[in-house]
């Protein structure tokens, strides 16, 4: 089953595979696809919920004759299934129960209020909810997303999944264990008053009664489930809130900016929305008249602990990466702006020559592409351009006032995407983004003051409330959207195919516990490889719980400088050792600077140490199972600042201009802090650390 799911086999492919097996090894596997699915099929059920074909009002899940309470249209479940007037609902409770019983360390964290914010649990809103007493020690909370995904190029059909993550899981575990409670399929966007209803109804029950589950000691727990955060883009967000879209009057989800056109700066500053006012506006609104941008009540208002203002976040994938960053690039390079002083399209060929030579580490999956191809760039590519490439590349190309303006934006994002964000730094970023948005109008004109530029003024509030931007971004949800698109073949029964395959994946680990218990190591290794998307970890051996090395090391002698560096660290003289050019420390893959396979398009050896030094990794030296170290060559920091804003008293501390040095050092693996991007631009070398070790493309 793991092979079938990993390689996304069609029913025909599976049938052929079963036939081949049965010809060579009769009776070892089921004979038909029906028997195969019966033996290894999905765990859990799903059911269709119907809506009126005329007005899309919710009709429920009962079979037989159905009558709409609004328009009195009469239909039945069979005809609704044929016409596609339904959506699929999966039990969120059973998915979370399975997750809780698998991840039993879920409640071991003790999040305390401190000077830094390192995840959602450190945010003010989460802490406030925890301190209210509504949330017990065994209770959990959710961050969820709803967005549309087009299925076919030749039609308008799309799916709208609701995805949920458990906040109390570690960030990587959180993103790897997404729950899918509802799936909409159709030619147009879902009618949210209908689509959200089963989701809200189940959440209301889970908030009140909780989920019963047993730990490894067979002790029963009851965990209530609270819906705290919705992270969706600016198109889906007003549908969920039942408000006007951003291009309408009072279309901002967080303040009372008039909108309806360019989001220019207003005096006085528009007042922030509140929960009480939103409820009043929703109740006062009618079909003919909206109130301050609110069209009416949303089903989400039935959830006792979900906030209609602070519960939504201005997530940065669409606002920052696909929003303001893309907008700036189009302003700079679009030929329609050739008469503007910010236009640099005539220099795009020169910039491309440098841009395509940049060699990011493996965490940045996509290598830089030509500026001419920017309409094909993904959100992760725009993120890389903003964080790592733009400032060094455009230095001396953009007029200084535009380049200094860009620095404010880059500075802010480096801090807000940090693994740990200092609360005092958020205040600095808030001033930086305020200046950025005010200058944006002066530099690029009022006509270019888009909603995304306006949304930047609300991002710092989101970080205070719910943690760093990476913690509430839609990147993981969008990635899972791509996974769902692989779960169907052909054009018939698409939602059913997607849901069945999703449930098969969910049940795979449960069934594997029994089936794989007595399997030999070779079979377990194959199974692990089929489950993992990180194939590099399958061919490695463990030195200790934090360090893994890859096969085929080099045996050799240390040079005199290398031997001296090792003696300085370990206190012993060593002449021979084993050299590893690929290794993993705390889940992060490193290469040596001489690793041949990666050197063409990647520089995966530039690191920052815990003491602040910048280095290139030469090799991992292993003397015994318990004695090893990393050999590095230091990069000399020139101390020159790339950029500075004297008014705000901020500098580009996240960019270091460096020179090569001959200083070789040996350091313990625990001293490796984070990977860096090494940029060569304008005949200078710059090192820019990755803001955090959690996000991956």
Predicted features along the sequence, with ranges:
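Short Cys/His-rich zinc-binding micro-motifs
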Residues: 51-61
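Short, conserved catalytic/metal-binding motifs centered on acidic residues
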Residues: 17, 147, 199, 227-231, ...
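Residues immediately within or flanking Cys/His clusters that coordinate Zn2+
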Residues: 46-49, 65, 249
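Charged (Asp/Glu and Lys/Arg) segments that form or flank catalytic channels of large polymer-
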Residues: 70-148, 157, 176, 205-392, ...
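N-terminal alpha-helical interaction blocks
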Residues: 1-49
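Terminal interaction-prone segments of large eukaryotic proteins
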Residues: 256, 341-697
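E2/UBC-UEV (E2-variant) core
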Residues: 162-214, 251-253, 257-310, 617-618, ...
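Short coil/turn segments at secondary-structure boundaries
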Residues: 64, 155-159, 176-177, 194-197, ...
